[in-house]
Amino acid sequence: MSRVAKNPVVIPKGVEVSISAAEIAIKGPLGTLVRPQHPAVTVEQDGEALVCKARDGQVNARAMSGTVRALLNNMVVGVSKGFERKLLLVGVGYRAQAQGDKLNLSLGFSHPVVHQMPAGVKVETPSQTEIVIKGVDKQQVGQVAAEVRAYRAPEPYKGKGVRYSDEVVVLKETKKK
Protein backbone atom coordinates (compact mmCIF):
# COMPACT_ATOMS: atom_id res chain seq x y z
CA MET A 1 0.00 0.00 0.00
CA SER A 2 1.13 3.53 -0.74
CA ARG A 3 2.36 5.53 2.25
CA VAL A 4 -0.03 8.33 1.35
CA ALA A 5 -3.00 5.93 1.28
CA LYS A 6 -2.21 4.63 4.77
CA ASN A 7 -3.49 7.89 6.25
CA PRO A 8 -7.30 8.15 6.20
CA VAL A 9 -9.07 11.26 4.89
CA VAL A 10 -10.74 12.95 7.88
CA ILE A 11 -14.25 14.21 7.12
CA PRO A 12 -14.98 17.52 8.93
CA LYS A 13 -18.39 18.49 10.33
CA GLY A 14 -20.81 19.74 7.69
CA VAL A 15 -19.40 17.51 4.94
CA GLU A 16 -21.41 14.55 3.64
CA VAL A 17 -19.94 11.67 1.63
CA SER A 18 -21.93 9.25 -0.51
CA ILE A 19 -20.15 6.29 -2.08
CA SER A 20 -21.74 4.27 -4.88
CA ALA A 21 -20.29 1.61 -7.17
CA ALA A 22 -19.65 4.14 -9.95
CA GLU A 23 -18.79 7.40 -8.18
CA ILE A 24 -17.99 9.24 -4.97
CA ALA A 25 -19.92 12.44 -4.16
CA ILE A 26 -18.77 14.86 -1.48
CA LYS A 27 -21.13 17.65 -0.42
CA GLY A 28 -20.15 20.54 1.81
CA PRO A 29 -21.07 24.14 2.64
CA LEU A 30 -19.34 25.50 -0.49
CA GLY A 31 -20.71 23.00 -3.01
CA THR A 32 -20.64 19.43 -4.29
CA LEU A 33 -17.89 17.51 -6.07
CA VAL A 34 -18.32 14.15 -7.82
CA ARG A 35 -15.50 11.84 -8.91
CA PRO A 36 -15.75 8.45 -10.66
CA GLN A 37 -14.53 5.42 -8.71
CA HIS A 38 -11.19 4.02 -9.85
CA PRO A 39 -11.49 0.30 -10.72
CA ALA A 40 -8.26 -0.65 -8.91
CA VAL A 41 -9.09 1.11 -5.60
CA THR A 42 -11.82 0.53 -3.01
CA VAL A 43 -13.00 3.49 -0.93
CA GLU A 44 -14.78 2.83 2.36
CA GLN A 45 -16.26 5.20 4.90
CA ASP A 46 -15.05 4.35 8.41
CA GLY A 47 -16.94 6.63 10.81
CA GLU A 48 -15.64 10.16 10.23
CA ALA A 49 -12.91 9.09 7.79
CA LEU A 50 -12.44 7.71 4.27
CA VAL A 51 -10.06 4.79 3.78
CA CYS A 52 -8.54 3.92 0.36
CA LYS A 53 -7.25 0.41 -0.31
CA ALA A 54 -5.92 -1.35 -3.39
CA ARG A 55 -8.25 -4.12 -4.64
CA ASP A 56 -5.30 -6.42 -5.32
CA GLY A 57 -1.59 -6.38 -4.57
CA GLN A 58 -0.47 -5.07 -7.95
CA VAL A 59 1.99 -2.18 -7.94
CA ASN A 60 -0.29 0.01 -10.10
CA ALA A 61 -3.24 -0.51 -7.74
CA ARG A 62 -1.14 0.32 -4.68
CA ALA A 63 0.17 3.48 -6.35
CA MET A 64 -3.33 4.54 -7.44
CA SER A 65 -4.64 4.14 -3.88
CA GLY A 66 -2.38 7.02 -2.81
CA THR A 67 -3.46 9.12 -5.77
CA VAL A 68 -7.16 8.51 -5.07
CA ARG A 69 -6.63 9.36 -1.39
CA ALA A 70 -4.97 12.69 -2.34
CA LEU A 71 -7.79 13.52 -4.78
CA LEU A 72 -10.45 12.72 -2.15
CA ASN A 73 -8.63 14.89 0.40
CA ASN A 74 -8.59 17.77 -2.12
CA MET A 75 -12.33 17.30 -2.65
CA VAL A 76 -13.03 17.40 1.11
CA VAL A 77 -10.89 20.52 1.60
CA GLY A 78 -12.48 22.15 -1.46
CA VAL A 79 -16.11 21.75 -0.34
CA SER A 80 -15.31 22.80 3.24
CA LYS A 81 -12.72 25.62 2.86
CA GLY A 82 -12.25 26.14 -0.89
CA PHE A 83 -9.12 26.88 -2.89
CA GLU A 84 -7.71 30.14 -4.21
CA ARG A 85 -4.83 31.19 -6.42
CA LYS A 86 -3.48 34.76 -6.50
CA LEU A 87 -1.91 36.27 -9.60
CA LEU A 88 0.02 39.53 -9.92
CA LEU A 89 0.37 41.69 -13.03
CA VAL A 90 3.82 43.29 -13.32
CA GLY A 91 4.38 45.81 -16.09
CA VAL A 92 3.47 49.32 -17.18
CA GLY A 93 -0.17 49.49 -18.24
CA TYR A 94 -0.98 45.90 -17.27
CA ARG A 95 -4.45 45.86 -15.71
CA ALA A 96 -7.16 43.38 -14.79
CA GLN A 97 -10.86 43.89 -14.19
CA ALA A 98 -13.45 41.28 -13.20
CA GLN A 99 -16.92 41.63 -14.72
CA GLY A 100 -19.21 38.84 -13.57
CA ASP A 101 -17.83 35.58 -14.94
CA LYS A 102 -15.38 37.34 -17.29
CA LEU A 103 -11.89 38.64 -16.65
CA ASN A 104 -10.79 41.59 -18.80
CA LEU A 105 -7.03 41.86 -19.13
CA SER A 106 -4.95 44.67 -20.60
CA LEU A 107 -1.52 43.09 -21.16
CA GLY A 108 0.20 45.33 -23.68
CA PHE A 109 -1.38 43.73 -26.74
CA SER A 110 -3.17 45.80 -29.38
CA HIS A 111 -6.45 44.34 -28.12
CA PRO A 112 -7.92 43.56 -24.69
CA VAL A 113 -7.90 39.91 -23.61
CA VAL A 114 -11.21 38.56 -22.24
CA HIS A 115 -11.05 35.26 -20.34
CA GLN A 116 -14.35 33.44 -19.71
CA MET A 117 -14.45 31.72 -16.30
CA PRO A 118 -15.82 28.16 -16.23
CA ALA A 119 -18.72 27.20 -13.96
CA GLY A 120 -17.65 26.78 -10.36
CA VAL A 121 -14.79 29.29 -10.53
CA LYS A 122 -15.08 32.88 -9.29
CA VAL A 123 -12.66 35.70 -9.98
CA GLU A 124 -12.01 38.88 -7.99
CA THR A 125 -9.70 41.83 -8.61
CA PRO A 126 -8.85 43.54 -5.28
CA SER A 127 -6.67 45.99 -7.23
CA GLN A 128 -5.91 46.56 -10.91
CA THR A 129 -2.74 44.47 -10.71
CA GLU A 130 -4.07 41.62 -8.53
CA ILE A 131 -6.28 38.68 -9.52
CA VAL A 132 -7.77 36.17 -7.06
CA ILE A 133 -9.25 32.97 -8.52
CA LYS A 134 -11.46 30.95 -6.13
CA GLY A 135 -13.33 27.66 -6.38
CA VAL A 136 -14.01 24.26 -4.81
CA ASP A 137 -12.13 22.14 -7.38
CA LYS A 138 -8.36 22.46 -6.88
CA GLN A 139 -7.53 21.20 -10.36
CA GLN A 140 -9.94 23.63 -12.04
CA VAL A 141 -8.69 26.63 -10.02
CA GLY A 142 -5.08 25.78 -10.91
CA GLN A 143 -5.97 25.26 -14.58
CA VAL A 144 -7.71 28.64 -14.87
CA ALA A 145 -4.77 30.36 -13.13
CA ALA A 146 -2.34 28.68 -15.55
CA GLU A 147 -4.44 29.76 -18.55
CA VAL A 148 -4.49 33.40 -17.37
CA ARG A 149 -0.73 33.30 -16.68
CA ALA A 150 -0.10 31.86 -20.16
CA TYR A 151 -1.43 35.03 -21.84
CA ARG A 152 1.76 36.83 -20.80
CA ALA A 153 4.18 34.69 -18.78
CA PRO A 154 6.93 36.59 -16.92
CA GLU A 155 9.80 37.37 -19.26
CA PRO A 156 13.32 36.68 -17.94
CA TYR A 157 14.95 40.12 -18.39
CA LYS A 158 12.61 42.59 -16.66
CA GLY A 159 10.13 40.15 -15.10
CA LYS A 160 7.12 41.76 -16.79
CA GLY A 161 4.02 39.61 -17.17
CA VAL A 162 1.45 37.67 -15.18
CA ARG A 163 2.90 35.68 -12.28
CA TYR A 164 1.67 33.70 -9.30
CA SER A 165 1.90 35.63 -6.02
CA ASP A 166 4.35 33.08 -4.60
CA GLU A 167 6.39 32.73 -7.81
CA VAL A 168 10.01 33.87 -7.87
CA VAL A 169 11.14 35.04 -11.30
CA VAL A 170 14.90 34.67 -11.71
CA LEU A 171 16.10 37.55 -13.87
CA LYS A 172 18.85 37.13 -16.46
CA GLU A 173 21.63 39.64 -16.89
CA THR A 174 21.61 41.66 -20.09
CA LYS A 175 24.32 41.13 -22.67
CA LYS A 176 27.46 43.17 -21.97
CA LYS A 177 29.72 44.55 -24.70
From Swiss-Prot:
Keyword annotations from UniProtKB, A to Z: Ribonucleoprotein, Ribosomal protein, RNA-binding, rRNA-binding
PANTHER family the record matches: 60S/50S RIBOSOMAL PROTEIN L6/L9 (PTHR11655), LARGE RIBOSOMAL SUBUNIT PROTEIN UL6M (PTHR11655:SF14)
UniProt entry tagged with the keyword RNA-binding: yes
Native organism: Azoarcus sp. (strain BH72)
Biological process annotations from GO: cytoplasmic translation
One GO location term (cellular component): cytosolic large ribosomal subunit
Self-association and partners: Part of the 50S ribosomal subunit.
Function: This protein binds to the 23S rRNA, and is important in its secondary structure. It is located near the subunit interface in the base of the L7/L12 stalk, and near the tRNA binding site of the peptidyltransferase center.
GO molecular function, one term: structural constituent of ribosome
SUPFAM superfamilies assigned to the protein according to its UniProt record, in alphabetical order: Ribosomal protein L6
Top-rank taxon, per record: Bacteria
Pfam families for the chain: Ribosomal_L6
InterPro entries xrefs: Ribosomal_uL6-like, Ribosomal_uL6-like_a/b-dom_sf, Ribosomal_uL6_a/b-dom, Ribosomal_uL6_bac-type, Ribosomal_uL6_CS
Protein name in UniProt: Large ribosomal subunit protein uL6
Similarity comment: family membership: Belongs to the universal ribosomal protein uL6 family.
Cited Gene3D superfamilies: Ribosomal protein L6, alpha-beta domain
